[in-house]
Regions:
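A conserved catalytic-core segment of Leloir-type glycosyltransferases
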Residues: 41-92
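A short beta-strand/loop micro-motif in the catalytic core of glycosyltransferases
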Residues: 33, 139-146, 161, 192
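Active-site proximal beta-strand in glycosyltransferases
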Residues: 32, 96-99, 109-124
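Membrane-proximal helix-turn-helix segments that form the acceptor-binding/catalytic region
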Residues: 81-85, 109, 123-145, 149-153
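Carbohydrate-associated surface elements
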Residues: 148, 166, 175
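N-terminal subdomain of nucleotide-sugar transferases
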Residues: 1-44
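Conserved donor-binding/catalytic core segment of Leloir-type glycosyltransferases
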Residues: 182-193
Length: 193
């Protein structure tokens, strides 16, 4: 059976792939359900961006500061309900959760799962340090993009692997494509897309 990954992305799906997109598109023999922040696709059902990978925009919900406990919990309960409905629709049972930001700690109690990955690619100065500590503690494995992030997270988890940011080198080093016959007789410059 296929492995199931439920990814909480802190960035929307883009034509120029982010770190999270690069990682999720490389999952082999897997189904990936990636949740992006609310945006222009919030009212649409999930969009299949490639075989085995569906992107769903989270619904816009009223955000509340943590000090407003009732509203804060309500915010994450509403997100959890939406995510569980999507899981049911896509037949996800107990996926591996792939978290990319400290705030995702609040979704762990809302979503059934069999394990947690925290992929940390940056510092989060505007999110509570406690959230990140709790997420790192809850994670079965932490991927960190730099040695500094490993040092920062190592008090909370001893299963940390360095996964540096990088470039998809083959994508940028392809040989130039052969000019189609219908364009060979045209003088330059040739503009198009």
């Amino acid at each position: 059976s296929l492995k199931q990954f439920l990814c909480f992305s802190c960035e929307p799906w883009r034509p120029a792939p982010t770190r999270t997109q690069q990682l999720m598109t490389r999952m082999r023999d897997a189904q990936v359900l990636l949740f992006e922040p609310p945006g222009k696709y919030s009212r649409q059902p999930g969009r299949r961006v490639r075989p085995g990978l569906t992107v769903c925009a989270l619904p816009p919900v009223l955000e509340a500061e943590e000090r407003h406990r009732l509203l804060f919990r309500l915010h994450y309960r509403k997100l959890g309900k939406f995510i569980r409905r999507q899981m049911e629709h896509h037949r996800f049972k107990e996926p591996l959760l792939w978290c990319t930001a400290p705030e995702h700690i609040h979704l762990l109690d809302e979503v059934p799962h069999r394990g947690v990955v925290y992929d940390c690619d940056r510092d989060w100065p505007h999110q509570s340090p406690r959230w990140e500590s709790d997420l790192a503690l809850a994670a079965d494995v932490v991927f960190a993009a730099s040695q500094g992030l490993i040092d920062h997270l190592s008090p909370c988890n001893d299963n940390i692997a360095l996964l540096p940011n990088g470039v998809n080198h083959p994508m940028f080093t392809r040989p130039p494509a052969e000019l189609p016959p219908e364009l060979r007789g045209l003088s330059s410059p040739i503009l198009g897309y």
